[in-house]
């Protein structure tokens, strides 16, 4: 197994500690060859569900934002990636401030992608957004790893599984959930 496969495998073993168990050597080698996307639900927020009435994208003061713990968790995700020598090809984020902040604190960079936006209050938008996500997954170059920072409703809609705040789901080009878990520095 080459260094890249080993590093991705290290990360997947940490991710795989949750319900799925540690992935096999074959699945690790396949993900290293074929690539995939690490979906990350934004890290911990101030208490609440959804956003306050009348919130506005681009106006963080009108939204539910990361808590101090959530900011530390995001920094920890970035440290975990650095510790394992992993560099995603792209970091894409929902336009919600809590997702942008998670991406910025973890990776120092991100691009907004409206397909990752929450559909909590606009469920009629979920099907077209999930189609866009699946299309990009299918077009992912072999061996490429991307990070998408998003919301529970998007991750559940794509995979059928429910993520905790800050949890990562590794999905392959077909949208199949391969591993899941929390990434913390030191692990």
Which residues make up each language-model segment?
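N-terminal export signals
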Residues: 5-21
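Active-site-proximal alpha-helix that buttresses catalytic centers in soluble enzyme cores
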Residues: 23-123, 131, 161-187
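Generic beta-sheet signal
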Residues: 35-38, 142-150
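Glycine-rich phosphate-binding loop signature in dinucleotide/nucleotide-binding domains
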Residues: 84-86, 140-143
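A short, acidic, amphipathic alpha-helical segment used as a generic capping/interface helix at domain edges
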Residues: 130-140
């Amino acid at each position: 197994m080459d260094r890249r496969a080993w590093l991705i495998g290290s990360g997947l073993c940490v991710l795989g500690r949750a319900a799925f168990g540690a992935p096999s050597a074959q699945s690790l080698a396949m993900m290293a060859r074929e690539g995939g996307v690490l979906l990350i639900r934004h890290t911990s927020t101030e208490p609440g569900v959804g956003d306050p009435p009348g919130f506005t994208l681009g106006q963080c003061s009108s939204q539910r934002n990361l808590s101090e713990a959530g900011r530390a968790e995001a920094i920890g995700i970035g440290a975990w990636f650095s510790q394992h020598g992993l560099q995603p090809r792209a970091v894409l984020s929902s336009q919600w401030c809590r997702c942008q902040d998670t991406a910025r604190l973890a990776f120092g960079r991100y691009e907004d992608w409206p397909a990752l936006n929450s559909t909590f209050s606009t469920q009629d938008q979920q099907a077209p957004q999930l189609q866009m996500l699946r299309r990009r997954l299918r077009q992912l170059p072999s061996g490429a790893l991307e990070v998408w920072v998003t919301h529970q409703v998007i991750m559940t809609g794509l995979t059928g599984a429910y993520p905790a705040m800050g949890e990562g789901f590794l999905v392959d080009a077909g949208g199949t959930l391969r591993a899941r878990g929390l990434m913390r520095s030191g692990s």
